[in-house]
Each structure stands twice: as structure tokens, then as C-alpha cells.
Amino acid sequence: MGRANKVVLAYSGGVDTSVCIPYLKQEWGVEEVITFAADLGQGDELEPIRQKALDAGASQSLVGDLIQPFIEEFAFPAIRANALYEGRYPLSTALARPLIARRLVEVAREVGADAVAHGCTGKGNDQVRFDVAIAALAPDLKVLTPAREWGMSREETIAYGERCGIPAPVSKKSPYSIDLNLLGRSIEAGPLEDPMVAPPEEVFAMTSPMSDTPDAAEEIEIAFEAGNPVAINGQVLDPVAMIREANRLAGSHGIGRLDMIENRVVGIKSREIYETPGLLLLIQAHQELESLTLAADVLRSKRQLEMQWADLVYQGLWFGPLKDALDGFMDRTQQHVNGVVRLRLYKGNATVIGRGSTQSSLYVPAMASYGSEDAFDHRAAEGFIYVWGLPTRLWAASQRTSG
């Protein structure tokens, strides 16, 4: 008897997930493999996937359009949380995994599968994200992980696939592993594994090389309501269109490239190249608007919790209790994050040059001004400073006495 009867495999069309199809059937005795590929805004990349999975031995090849929930339910909460893993990476890949896992479980229920599978290796982050999410959503489903167990090198995996009639998609000329969705691209492997090797221009697709960016700066305005971006330059956009337009604007100016050494969940460091033009632009604008509309103590607390929120998502704990609790905090803070941020885009940089809110601004010109309209009570400062500095004076006096 095989490890499962009917399996739904999370399918990308890459080497590992393609080889998983014959491997599950031939090596693990799975009777039927159904593949599911998520359309997350990859574009034309998904067109050949259906037939490729069928050619590899899948009984059904399903593709699901998840673009709208991806942006509304995953990307927008990340913008509201200013989610930047290790202060830099806006989680463009990590945000997709809990959504794929959720839909994978739903498909398994619909087709009566007794297991799900993925093609993640044993040293990556995605295996953690998929396994933990599936365990939270459907603890009764088996999770099969052939790529984690088969012990084959990448070359051996490609050779196994070729014996099963699966062509190798990666050539020596292009040795990179690329993950793509509407939020961005992640590029790794090949010569990029040497952290001293500069990424060649050929690995980028969403951002213009600096030599091709406009020589004139472009100023734009992004409007937010309840923490969500809703308009660019006065044009109201739905969430998906918002990301597309932000990608276009930022990418055309070469904004959104990241080259970083990243600490993976499994404990190793990896070199990652990311392109996330629109998401980084929107997070930057959102942060700036919060500085205008949130009280100081709320803002300080939120900045600390943002790091924890990003860590939880990166570590595959989207469906965990702490993430759920932090969502409540984030949502509550966003009620008054309404307004407009003006940015100047130029040669790889987005610079905030203005911000305003007619509804929620806590910036009071009469209090901030040093001119004749100054309404701040300067006389009150003396008493405030006396009380504020009292602990310091008492401590200093005790040091003089003991010394």
C-alpha cells in the first residue's frame, strides 16, 4: 500500500514539483496525483503549466486565480503592518504561502484527497510555511514531502525527471531559481550563492536598470483610507490595480531592488535578491502617513510589534494565535490612518516630500510654529522639566553621596 491514495500537489511547474509527480506514483505508490497551481499574478508563466503537469503524470491539472485574495487578504495587511523582515524584505514570497496552503486544503476537500504534497526542500523556509499552515487548517490531512526525503542533488533531480520525460527548465546559461508573483520576484542560486558576486542585470525584470531610468524626477501622491492605499495621483484604484500601478511607477525609476543576507527559519544564512517595487513604495508612504496620524506612544509600540508581525509571517505562523492577536492591534491603529503622501521618484530612490490628512492629522501648526501664531505655553515647560528630570536628579544625588 502506498503512502496515500489521492494527493493534491502544490505545483509551480519547476524542477522539483514536476519530478514530484512521477516520484509520488512510482516510488511512494500514490495512485492519483492532482496538481494545483496558484495564479498570483505571474502573468504568462502559468499558461503551459496545465499540460506540463499532465505530461508528467498528473490525472488533473488545476490552476486557481488567487490574485484578488492575495492582495486584499495578505498584501494589504502587510502594508498596514509595515511588514519588513529584518527591516528590509517586504515578504513578497512569504505572504503567498499561507494562501496557497489554504487553497490546497480546500481543493483536497473538494476532490476527496487523503493527502497534500509540496516540492519544498529540507533547507528552505517554504517547507515550514506549508507544513505549519496545513497542520493548522487540516490536521487530518497527510503532508507528503518527497523533495525533502528523496536525497537527490539538483543535478540528480533533473536527471530523474528527464528519465520520466520531463525536460530540464534551467540551462547552464540561466542557473537561477526564481519565484514570481504580483508583489515581486525572488532570485537565488547559481553564481548568486557567492555573496561577493554582484547580481547581473539579467536577473531583474520588474525594475529598470539605472541607465534606463528617467533623468527627470517624477512626483506622485498616494492616498490612504484606514491604512489601505486607495488612489494614486487622484485616481481611485482597486487593490490589484493599485499594486500593478505602484509596480509600474516604482519599477520605471529602478526602485525596489534588494540584495541581502537573510536568516532563514532553519537556522542558516542565505543570499537573496528581491524585486518588490510597488510593495516597498506603498509601505514607505504608509509609514510616513502614520507618523502624522498616530499618537507617539501608539507609533512606538506599533514599530516594535511590526517587527514581530513580520517575523511571524516569515516563519510560517500566519494562522497562529499571536499573529491573530497582533492583527487586532494593527487593525485598531489603522482607523485614523487617512490622508495623502507625496513622493519624488528618481534614480532608485523614493523620497517623501509631503504628507497631509484633513481627517486625522495630529500635527497642529499653531503648536509646532515658532512664529507669531505660536500657541504653545512656554511657561509650562519649566514645571514639566522639573518633574520629568526628578528621577535623574535623585539618582545623581545618590551617586554623589555614595561616592
From Swiss-Prot:
GO terms for biological process: argininosuccinate metabolic process; L-arginine biosynthetic process; urea cycle. Pfam families: Arginosuc_syn_C, Arginosuc_synth. It is an enzyme of class 6 (ligase). L-aspartate binds at residues 121, 125-126. Its main location: cytoplasm. GO terms for molecular function: argininosuccinate synthase activity; ATP binding. It catalyses: L-citrulline + L-aspartate + ATP = 2-(N(omega)-L-arginino)succinate + AMP + diphosphate + H(+). L-citrulline binds at residues 89, 125, 129, 177, 186, 262, 274. Pathway: Amino-acid biosynthesis; L-arginine biosynthesis; L-arginine from L-ornithine and carbamoyl phosphate: step 2/3. GO terms for cellular component: cytoplasm. It is found in: Cytoplasm. ATP binds at residues 10-18, 38, 119. Its EC number is 6.3.4.5. Keywords: Amino-acid biosynthesis, Arginine biosynthesis, ATP-binding, Cytoplasm, Ligase, Nucleotide-binding. Gene3D superfamilies: Argininosuccinate synthetase, chain A, domain 2, HUPs, Single helix bin. Homotetramer. Belongs to the argininosuccinate synthase family. Type 1 subfamily. This is Argininosuccinate synthase. It comes from Parasynechococcus marenigrum (strain WH8102). The gene is argG.
